[in-house]
Regions:
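Pre-Walker A adenine-sensing motif
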Residues: 17-28, 60-61
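Conserved glycine(s) of the Walker
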Residues: 42
Length: 156
C-alpha cells in the first residue's frame, strides 16, 4: 500500500474533480473491461473495429466520436491469416487517409502459439510494458492468456 495514496476527503469535498476520461462509453481510462458472448458472435471483429476507431480511424460503431490514441491488439487465438481477412474487410470501407491513420495508431501482434500467461510475472510485466502510453489494449481472447480454470473464483 506504500504506492497508493489515500484520498483527502476534505479536499474532495471542496475541489471539483477532474473530468472523467472515457476510452469507450462507460469505460474509464485505466480500467479493465470485458466483451463477453458465445463463440462465433463476432467479438474479435468488434474488438478490431473498436481498436481501429480509437487508433485514429473513422467512426465505425455506434457511440459517436471517441478520444483517439495508440492501441495495441494482441490476438492469441486467431492465426494471422484470419486477422488479415478482417483487416481486408475493414479496409474496403476506408479511404487512403483513414487506412494510414489506423496503420499509424494500431499495433497488432499475433500471439498464437506463444502460450501467454498473465499469471506468470514475465508475461504480466511484458503486457504492462506493452500497455504503457496506449489508449487501449485488447487481449483476444482472455481464455488464451492464462492457464487457470476460468470458472474458479480465486484466480479469476
Amino acid at each position: 500500500m506504500a504506492t497508493h495514496k489515500p484520498i483527502n476527503i476534505l479536499e474532495a469535498f471542496a475541489a471539483a474533480p477532474p473530468p472523467l476520461d472515457y476510452v469507450l462509453p462507460n469505460m474509464v481510462a485505466g480500467t479493465v473491461g470485458a466483451l463477453v458472448s458465445p463463440g462465433g458472435a463476432g467479438k474479435s471483429m468488434l474488438a478490431l473495429l473498436l481498436a481501429a476507431q480509437i487508433a485514429g480511424g473513422p467512426v465505425v460503431l455506434v457511440g459517436g466520436v471517441l478520444p483517439t490514441g495508440p492501441v495495441i491488439y494482441l490476438p492469441a487465438e486467431d492465426p494471422p491469416t484470419a486477422i488479415h481477412h478482417r483487416l481486408h474487410a475493414l479496409g474496403a470501407h476506408l479511404s487512403a487517409e483513414e487506412r494510414q491513420a489506423v496503420a499509424d495508431g494500431l499495433l497488432i501482434q499475433p500471439l498464437i502459439g506463444s502460450l501467454p500467461n498473465i499469471m506468470a510475472p514475465e508475461w504480466f510485466d511484458g503486457l504492462k510494458r506493452a500497455a504503457e502510453g496506449r489508449r487501449l489494449m485488447v487481449l483476444d481472447t482472455l481464455r488464451r492468456f492464462h492457464i487457470e480454470e476460468e470458472n474458479a473464483s480465486g484466480p479469476m
